[in-house]
Amino acid sequence: EKGYHAIYLPPTRAKVRVALEKLKNECALQEAEYAQAAVEIFQLTDYKSREENYYSSMLAKADIEKEIIKYTEGIQGAIFASGRREYIVFSNSGAVQEEFNQRKLLNLQKKVQEENKISLNVGIGTGGTMNEAEMNARRALDFSLKNAKQEIFWIDAGQTQHGPLGKEIQLEYQLISSDPKLQEISEKT
């Protein structure tokens, strides 16, 4: 209307092809990340079996196990007891990272604490293999236990630690530095 010349430059076939290839690669990468192995390790702390309340403590533990099983069913995982107070859940990264499932996990943790006065510490690990995911979950659980608070930490396949989940301020940092100067210093020591 103002007399300016307008020129329409349609994208070339090559640019369209490159854009579609890039989109396809991004989708494949995201799908691969969500298909990674995930392991969650639940550990009951502050759990004391008293002789005078032997049966009531067994019933409380059974109620907690039911809740953990319901959570595991919701994420379509598999659960295994490991010792008296530890449970290992195998799933995929997509299910574990989903915000809805993380809220369910936080609610489970809160419910166990309020109803049974038992802390439920959780370590989550993801990785290319179940072994790598479990090692990451163990490290995350150790960090949770070290803080002596009821918290959830997660270590991903890239060795980045996230947490505590569900808190207003969540930290995210690399456990292994990629800085060449720091790597050189660590090799010398």
Per-segment meaning from a language model:
Residues 1-84, 157, 161-189:
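Interdomain helical linkers/hinges and coiled-coil/dimerization scaffolds
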Residues 56, 60-64, 100-104, 133:
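Short amphipathic alpha-helical segments
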Residues 91-115:
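GGDEF/GGEEF active-site signature
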Residues 16-24, 134-145:
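Two-component system phosphotransfer/interaction surface
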Residues 82, 90, 123-125, 155:
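Generic beta-strand/beta-sheet core signal
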Residues 111-121, 136-180, 184:
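Catalytic/regulatory signature loops of cyclic-dinucleotide turnover enzymes
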Residues 79-97:
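Short beta-strand->loop micro-motif that forms the acidic, two-metal-ion catalytic signature
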Residues 47, 92-99, 118-136:
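Catalytic strand-loop-helix junctions within cyclic-nucleotide turnover domains
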